[in-house]
Amino acid sequence: MRRKTNIFWIIFSCSTLCFLSLIGVFLRIHQSKPTLASYSSAPVVIIDAGHGGMDGGAIGVDGQIEKEINLSIALKLDTMLRAYGFQTIMTRDSDVSIHSPDAKTVRQQKTSDLRNRLKLLEDTSSGILISIHQNKYSQSSAHGTQVFYGKNCPESKELAEMLQKTITGYLQPENTREIKQATKDIYILYQATKPAVMVECGFLSNAAEADKLTDEEYQDQIAFSICTALMNCLADQS
């Protein structure tokens, strides 16, 4: 009987120590995690789900449609940022183009759509834009996230660097792509006077990556990486 009692107390003690250790780990992680209250001034995050409506964007090797993937990731990111207390604005939260009513032709509608997205950023006090897109290339071997940034604001490059580092570190350790400054072909980033970045999450021309980009769990991981990168970048700047 005494032996059974000793064994019980040994098991109980070990279990208690393990439990306390887990609590300690949790508290260290929780305390080190950036919170909105730690930032000197929190931006209004404009989440831009690229394309929409009549503009489907890139089409994947198995028929995946870019605009749908963009919106799915953007909605997930919106939910995460709001959970952390951020104020967010989505350029679209459904399958629509946001062109002005007087735009009649497809060309006019696409141009108007881009201008309205840019205007939303420029009209938002303390606005910062994160645009979600997917890539496509003639060579199916091309893969990996790549982040582009606007040229008119130093914070854009800082955020792009943190995004690239976080996404590749968490999801794509083999990805050696580097961030790029946007050219005039990326209208919103090129014209923006406020912080603006575009996350090309992956290549729809790569069959394996296209499959991942349509996977809900992988989309959650992409959105989480973007959310984490933004918070870490703001913490560094504060």
Question: For the regions a protein language model found, what residue spans apply to each?
Answer:
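Catalytic-site microenvironment of enzymes
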Residues: 1-238
